[in-house]
Amino acid sequence: LVCSRLLNRPVVQSRQDIRPFHIADYDLHKFDPRDRETQKKFHLYFKNRGIDLSTQYAFHRHFCLATKYDAEETIHTCLAFPLTLPKGDGTVVGFEERDCVRIDGSSNYQDKAEEGNTNEGLWIVSPAQTPLAEAKHVYWFESAYDAMAYYQLHQAQNQELQKAVFVSTGGKPIEKQTRDVLELTIPATQHICFNNNRKGWNFKRELQQEICRTVHSAIEETPERKP
């Protein structure tokens, strides 16, 4: 497992190792824009990332604090970004978990919960609640934190960002994830905002290739050009 990660090889869990995701197994604390008391618990999570309150308001429907007992009956709480399927009905199929903290105060950084459909699920968000299939602009990120930070930096100069759709892959993009989004958003402009490092460059190249494949497969030959 460690060697695979060092060599940037995908780590694939066998189906029997992937635990089913049940949102009812979690105690959820949500951000209410009309109740300052509900907002206070999020302060430390977002303060450390430089995410201001107005940005939290813009994305408040799409994050929460998720608390769950692990196998040793130890409570841990994470900032959770719900994952949904691009072609689904909005049902939450997993979490992109960030900054997990156990009850003893120890922390455990995670990209995604070790359960649920994280191979197909994505964090798919629009501040203006634009449906994915109606998006004119789609912005791709490796984490939900990155997406929120980008919005915060650019929304004053680009009011159209409110209508855009932000997608977080929660790490390495998986072909099934990207293909389902692209098939729904062929007319949209795809903005690739992955990290500016070797992994990010590789992710960008893979997504560009998938964009080309998706667009090419959608082109229908005219009768004059068909063999």
Identify the role of each PLM range.
Residues L1-S4, F63-C64:
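Short, small/acidic-rich helices and loops at N termini and domain boundaries
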Residues Q152-P227:
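TOPRIM fold recognition
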Residues E73-E183:
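Phosphate-handling DNA/RNA-contact segment within nucleic-acid enzymes
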